[in-house]
Amino acid sequence: MTIAFQLAVFALIATSSILLISVPVVFASSDGWSSNKNIVFSGTSLWIGLVFLVAILNSLIS
């Protein structure tokens, strides 16, 4: 169970880092938002899901 928690935390940190870099790049590009809107929403949905997964796994470990 601890390994699953650690992998979920790593995935959350990696997703956060990717979104931290990619979202400003998408907004700064000229046609970026209209062409990459689905990717940004998918990444945000993944991030929210990982937050809940980490919270659930944390409650099971503690």
Swiss-Prot record:
InterPro entries: PSII_PsbZ (IPR002644), PSII_PsbZ_sf (IPR036512)
Keywords: Chloroplast, Membrane, Photosynthesis, Photosystem II, Plastid, Reaction center, Thylakoid, Transmembrane, Transmembrane helix
Gene Ontology, cellular component aspect: chloroplast thylakoid membrane; photosystem II reaction center
Transmembrane domains' residue ranges: 8-28, 41-61
UniProt keyword Membrane present: yes
Main location: plastid
Keyword Transferase: no
Membrane-protein topology: Multi-pass membrane protein
One Pfam family cited in the UniProt record for this chain: Ycf9
Cellular compartments annotated: Plastid, Chloroplast thylakoid membrane
GO biological process: photosynthesis; photosystem II stabilization
Biological function: May control the interaction of photosystem II (PSII) cores with the light-harvesting antenna, regulates electron flow through the 2 photosystem reaction centers. PSII is a light-driven water plastoquinone oxidoreductase, using light energy to abstract electrons from H(2)O, generating a proton gradient subsequently used for ATP formation.
Assembly behavior: PSII is composed of 1 copy each of membrane proteins PsbA, PsbB, PsbC, PsbD, PsbE, PsbF, PsbH, PsbI, PsbJ, PsbK, PsbL, PsbM, PsbT, PsbY, PsbZ, Psb30/Ycf12, at least 3 peripheral proteins of the oxygen-evolving complex and a large number of cofactors. It forms dimeric complexes.
Family listed: Belongs to the PsbZ family.
HAMAP family: PSII_PsbZ
Protein name, UniProt field: Photosystem II reaction center protein Z
Naturally occurring in which organism (per UniProt): Amborella trichopoda
Encoding gene, per UniProt annotation: psbZ
